[in-house]
UniProtKB/Swiss-Prot annotation:
GO terms for cellular component: nucleus; RNA polymerase III complex. This is DNA-directed RNA polymerase III subunit rpc3. The keyword Transcription applies. Component of the RNA polymerase III (Pol III) complex consisting of 17 subunits. Interacts with maf1. It comes from the Eukaryota. Residues 517-538 are annotated as: Leucine-zipper. One of its GO terms (biological process) is transcription by RNA polymerase III. It comes from Schizosaccharomyces pombe (strain 972 / ATCC 24843). It is found in: Nucleus. GO terms for molecular function: single-stranded DNA binding. Keywords: DNA-directed RNA polymerase, Nucleus, Transcription, Zinc. The keyword Nucleus applies. The lineage of its organism: Eukaryota, Fungi, Dikarya, Ascomycota, Taphrinomycotina. Belongs to the RNA polymerase beta chain family. DNA-dependent RNA polymerase catalyzes the transcription of DNA into RNA using the four ribonucleoside triphosphates as substrates. Specific core component of RNA polymerase III which synthesizes small RNAs, such as 5S rRNA and tRNAs.
Amino acid sequence: MSQYAVELCEILVEEFFGDCCSAVASALLRHGRLTIPMLQKRTSLPGPKIRQALVSLMQHHMVLYVTVIENVREVTYYETQWKEIYNILRKGKDVYLISQKLNQEAASVVKYLSTQGRARVLEVFNAFDKKVDGSDEESRMMQKNLTELIYQKFLLVVQPRHLIPVGDQEMQLRIKHLDRRKSENVSEIKKNREVDDSVALEMLELRAADMSELQGLTRKPKESIPHPTKRRKRAVGSAPSVSTDLNNILDDDNSILVPDLSAHVRINSGKLSVLSKNARLTHWVERRIGKSTSLVYSHVLSMLEPRLFSISNQSPVFTLTTMELTRNFPNDIDVESSIVDKQYSVNSASNELRVMEKLNELDELAEEDNYEESVDENANRKSKVLAQHLELLADCSLKFISKIGNRGMGEWAVNFTHLTDMLRAIEYENFIEQKFGERAIRLLRIIKDKGKIEEKQLANIALLRQRDLRTVLQAMAEIGALELQEVPRSSDRAPSKTFFLWFHRPDRAYSLLLDELYHVIARLYMRLRDARAQRAQLIEKAERIDIKGNEEQYLQKFEQAELKKLYSYEEKLLLQASRLDDMVLVFRDNL
């Protein structure tokens, strides 16, 4: 963890939790695991205040704990989860994503949980003044939203072991399995191997239990729900749709899934990070191909979302067929008009031949497959159009998807490892282009293509003079985008007899950029804090109950102007921090 990430986390905790929590978090971030007596020495705070700060941070899973036996007594250590602290920046984005994916009421639930950290389902009902039995329309809507949030894993059910670091959980399981095998007469190597396998299997089972579809949900007789509606059948092979209502996630005709009132839930930041990255990928599809194809790709990614968190499928490659996409593609999205007909083509004869060949190929594939249900003419035409959009995605140089077979009018694969690497590469190139210009990105692409290249050879390939590119190369080397390797041709290592090879190391370049992003975001929040401190009296006056909402009546014109200027300044700084966070999302987290 870099010093800039530590500095940013300290600022965020101070901004949202106060000085006491910031002092405790800072000590844990800078010194690692500490006990309460150690924290008292590091922070000079009394024990009760430290305990209150730890409780507040543990409520948001920013601090975890583990109890161990030392000198025949129990000792509790605390450690920070710095990524959870950083996720404070994304709370607003999480609320917006849920409002787009589900509805505004579900977003209100996520907003409430983002302020509380975690809460019982019963507390959520009480906070919004809704009845848990769903006896009125608003309460039924709250029940439905909570069920969908839990079912689609936007909310995770909190277990006591979630407050223990994963490494300590594995250590506890390892000690337990070693105690069981004390009496076994086998070699230590074999015993350790078997224990490692047992620990890995048990951790996998615990994770599978966390991601179970029914985790945090209970069955309720259908008759107990006021004004029950008829259950609608879900399409075969479809993933849970965001527009699906509560009746679409029934287990059977006699019962319905409702949230467990005693379950503690919190926001699943991993799932929401995936949604943000999918939106970023869709943005690049729109830039490279077009709006309609980006809508098709967005739906492809949304269909694959449930599989990303599946325990049974650990492969980074996921597949789907054109027919599966057709059955689940919304009817209100028009993708047919985006495919250019022959009369609009520049070379109508060649385009007509190519389109007819593609349609004939799809017709042959449709005849070869034995589908259980007949496809009408509209669905068949829709499948052909979607297949054309998928072909565009596969033919793109960025390889958003790839074709792997002909099953179901075409089988397509999405490699999320490739997508992560590709997204980082194009985002980094975009950053270099904005910082140093088109010449820099041109040189970077040549160096990436050649691996290691000497400056003279680079000048010949780029059709530039050496003195013109040397400044650009040096500037990129200063930020870590390029590195220089010396290869002497003689033992005296004379500069005239030495090759100087330029090369690019992506991992190191991304890591240095990530540190710089943390540094810049921290400076933005420091500027925001200073701006508020300079106008502290004005802010305190504007936040009075009798003035809030009536600023024009109680504040003088120069105060209103100063307040408006401050809010505009805050908006600009927070917007810039949000844009930088989008880059952090790409370079730090995997899909």
